[in-house]
């Protein structure tokens, strides 16, 4: 943003795009201030929402950095990674994958009300904000709203979020909001997430890190989820950032009816099912090195 470019809408769109970008910051030159505080009240409100979401994405984004470091996987991935034989999308630039499981389509024009997005085939996608289900292998015109840019999650994905925080030092890994996007098209899923104390550059070398393994299996009307800590860091005084116990707010999306029953480690538990969002909320206490098994009996 330079010269007389004071477009608040595009400023906000830039920050919304930055949520799913390796670098999150506003840019400006000459006499244009880059900070949100110098924008309109509406722009400040929308900017605050985007900044808050960036912090909430910390568990997912931190794992992307690990995958990049350990395996060379890019954080931002072109859609032809999904369909390498589809020459029509070799230069497709209207959307990209943020990691393996999130599809993002930036909004680049002001006053735009809709845009066409290609959804990779052989997948089902869910709107990150509304839970709308979209079948892959098609180009779909989606309506835009000012609160966010089009963002979608792959069916079968686990997306870990942290509680609302205002800076990275507040992230302590003691609470986790874990979203699982259920769909019969993806009956088996395995995802692994890396985390450490966020300070020591030698965490992997020193063995001071944690690998969380999330597994989903669906058969008949039975959905089983396992949460495993396949490697737990050494809990020393220096690693107080990582409590041994976690409070997990498990949210299972695309559950069309209230389930017949939900069991955690063989015991029936009370859960909340939202009839509007079709989301099941399951609170779980998770101790270090402990495997949690969640069995959900669905209504057909």
Regions found by a protein language model. Give the residues of each.
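Accessory, solvent-exposed terminal regions and/or long lumenal/extracellular loops of proteins
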Residues: 153-260, 264-267, 274-277, 283-290, ...
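Solvent-exposed beta-strand/loop surfaces of large extracellular or lumenal domains
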Residues: 127-146, 261-283
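Preference for bulky hydrophobic residues occupying beta-strand positions
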Residues: 106, 117, 250-252, 282, ...
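Catalytic-domain carbohydrate-binding cleft regions of carbohydrate-active enzymes
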Residues: 1-149, 153-154, 195-198
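Extracellular interaction modules
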Residues: 144-146, 286-294
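Short, surface-exposed charged micro-motifs
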Residues: 94-95, 116, 213-215, 270-272
């Amino acid at each position: 943003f330079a010269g007389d470019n004071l477009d608040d809408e595009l400023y906000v769109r830039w920050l919304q795009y930055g949520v799913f970008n390796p670098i999150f910051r506003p840019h400006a030159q000459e006499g244009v201030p880059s900070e949100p505080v110098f924008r309109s009240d509406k722009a400040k409100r929308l900017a605050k929402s985007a900044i808050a979401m960036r912090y909430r994405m910390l568990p997912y984004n931190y794992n992307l950095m690990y995958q990049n470091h350990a395996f060379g996987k890019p954080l931002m991935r072109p859609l032809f990674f999904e369909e390498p034989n589809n020459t029509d999308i070799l230069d497709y630039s209207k959307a990209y994958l943020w990691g393996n499981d999130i599809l993002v389509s930036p909004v680049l024009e002001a006053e735009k009300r809709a845009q066409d997005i290609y959804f990779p085939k052989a997948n089902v996608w869910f709107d990150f904000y509304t839970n709308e289900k979209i079948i892959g292998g098609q180009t779909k015109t989606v309506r835009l709203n000012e609160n966010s840019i089009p963002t979608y999650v792959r069916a079968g994905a686990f997306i870990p979020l942290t509680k609302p925080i205002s800076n990275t030092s507040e992230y302590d890994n003691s609470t986790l909001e874990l979203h699982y996007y259920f769909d019969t098209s993806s009956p088996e899923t395995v995802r692994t997430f890396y985390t450490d104390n966020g300070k020591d550059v030698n965490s992997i070398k020193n063995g001071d890190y944690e690998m969380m393994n999330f597994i989903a299996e669906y058969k008949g009307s039975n959905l089983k989820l396992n949460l495993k800590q396949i490697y737990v860091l050494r809990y020393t005084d220096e690693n107080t950032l990582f409590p041994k116990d976690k409070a997990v707010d498990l949210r299972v999306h695309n559950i069309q009816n209230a389930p017949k029953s939900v069991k955690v480690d063989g015991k029936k538990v009370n859960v909340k099912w939202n009839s509007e969002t079709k989301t099941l909320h399951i609170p779980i206490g998770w101790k270090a090195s402990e495997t949690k098994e969640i069995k959900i009996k669905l209504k057909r």
